[in-house]
C-alpha cells in the first residue's frame, strides 16, 4: 500500500525501514466506536492487531467525513497494547490484541494516500491473494508433516494411507496453482474487475485444501496428532484459525455470480 499510495518520501522511508529489519503490519479491525481522525490526531483503538506492541509500524484505517483514511502509526509501544483478549487455540505467537491509537499524529508524514484508497477496487478484494498465499504456506506445512510421518512409519505402506495422502497432495497443489494465477492476475498492470472474481474463488479453493489436508493428517496419524508436543498439533491449530477470513460464503457467492454473468476465461484459448 505504501508502494501504491505513498509519497516519494514515504516510499524512501519504507525502503530504509525494511533494510533496517523493521516489521510493518496492517490493522483494520476495530471495536466500536472505531478509530477516527480528530484535531489532536487519531482517536480510538484497533482489535485483532497482530504484533501489537511488538511490530514497528502499522498501516491503520481511520474514519473521516470523506471515507477511510490510511495512517502510518507507531506500533511498538507496549503501554498501548492489550493482548489479554487474545485467548485463542492457535496463532498465540502473533501476540494479537487491542492497540490504543489515541493521540498518535496525523500529518503529511503519516497520512497515506487519500480517503477511500484502502478499499479501492480491484486492489482491495483482489489483494486477498496475499492472505491466501499465507494460508497456502500453512497447508503445505501440514502436508509436509503428514508426509514425513507416513514416510517414516509402516503406515506409509498401506494403500488407504497412500490414497488419502494423494488426495491431500492434489488438493494442496491445486491450491498452489490457483494462488499463483491469482497473484499474477491481481498484480498485472491491467488488472480489472474480473480479477476480483478469480481471487474470490481462489479463497475457497485454498480453504478447502486446508480442511482436506488437516483431516487427512488427523485420520492418518490419529490421536498422536493432537498431543501438544506434536508439531502437527500447533500447525493445525494455527492454520484452522487463519483459514477463518471474513465472509467466505459471500466471497464464493460473488465469484459464482460473476462467472455466471460472464465467461471468466475469455482470454484463455484452451478454455
Describe the residue ranges of each PLM region.
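Glycine-rich phosphate/cofactor-binding loops in nucleotide/flavin-utilizing enzymes
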Residues: 223-271
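Glycine-rich flavin
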Residues: 1-55, 260
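A short core secondary-structure module
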Residues: 48-81
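C-terminal helix-coil-helix/basic helical segment that borders enzyme active sites and/or dimer interfaces
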Residues: 151, 174-205, 215-226
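Buried hydrophobic positions in well-ordered alpha/beta secondary-structure cores of metabolic enzymes
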Residues: 7, 42-44, 101, 139, ...
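Generic structural signal for well-ordered, non-transmembrane alpha-helical segments
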Residues: 137, 166-173, 200, 204-211, ...
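Residue-level recognition of alpha-helical structural elements
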Residues: 10-11, 154-157, 161-164, 191-198, ...
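Glycine-rich beta->alpha junctions and the first turn(s) of the following alpha-helix
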Residues: 88-173
Amino acid at each position: 500500500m505504501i508502494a501504491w499510495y505513498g509519497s516519494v518520501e514515504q516510499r524512501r522511508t519504507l525502503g530504509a525501514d525494511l533494510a533496517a529489519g523493521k516489521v510493518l503490519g496492517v490493522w483494520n479491525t476495530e471495536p466500536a466506536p472505531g478509530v477516527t481522525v480528530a484535531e489532536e490526531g487519531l482517536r480510538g483503538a484497533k482489535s485483532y492487531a497482530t504484533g501489537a506492541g511488538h511490530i514497528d509500524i502499522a498501516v491503520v484505517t481511520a474514519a473521516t467525513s470523506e471515507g477511510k483514511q490510511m495512517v502510518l502509526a507507531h506500533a511498538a509501544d507496549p503501554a498501548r497494547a492489550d493482548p489479554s483478549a487474545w485467548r485463542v487455540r492457535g496463532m498465540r505467537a502473533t501476540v494479537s490484541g487491542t492497540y490504543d491509537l489515541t493521540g498518535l499524529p496525523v500529518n503529511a508524514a503519516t497520512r497515506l494516500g487519500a480517503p477511500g484508497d484502502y478499499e479501492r477496487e480491484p486492489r482491495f478484494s483482489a489483494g486477498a491473494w496475499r492472505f491466501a498465499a499465507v494460508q497456502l504456506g500453512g497447508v503445505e506445512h501440514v502436508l509436509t508433516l503428514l508426509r514425513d510421518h507416513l514416510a517414516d512409519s509402516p503406515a506409509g505402506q498401506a494403500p488407504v494411507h497412500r490414497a488419502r495422502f494423494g488426495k491431500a497432495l492434489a488438493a494442496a497443489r491445486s491450491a498452489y496453482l490457483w494462488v499463483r494465477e491469482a497473484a499474477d492476475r491481481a498484480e498485472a498492470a491491467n488488472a480489472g474487475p474480473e480479477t476480483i472474481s478469480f481471487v474470490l474463488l481462489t479463497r475457497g479453493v485454498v480453504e478447502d485444501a486446508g480442511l482436506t489436508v488437516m483431516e487427512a493428517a488427523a485420520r492418518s496419524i490419529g490421536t498422536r496428532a493432537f498431543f501438544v508436543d506434536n508439531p502437527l498439533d500447533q500447525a493445525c491449530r494455527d492454520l484452522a484459525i487463519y483459514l477463518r477470513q471474513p465472509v467466505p460464503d459471500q466471497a464464493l457467492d460473488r465469484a459464482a455470480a460473476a462467472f455466471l454473468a460472464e465467461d471468466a476465461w475469455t482470454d484463455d484459448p484452451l478454455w
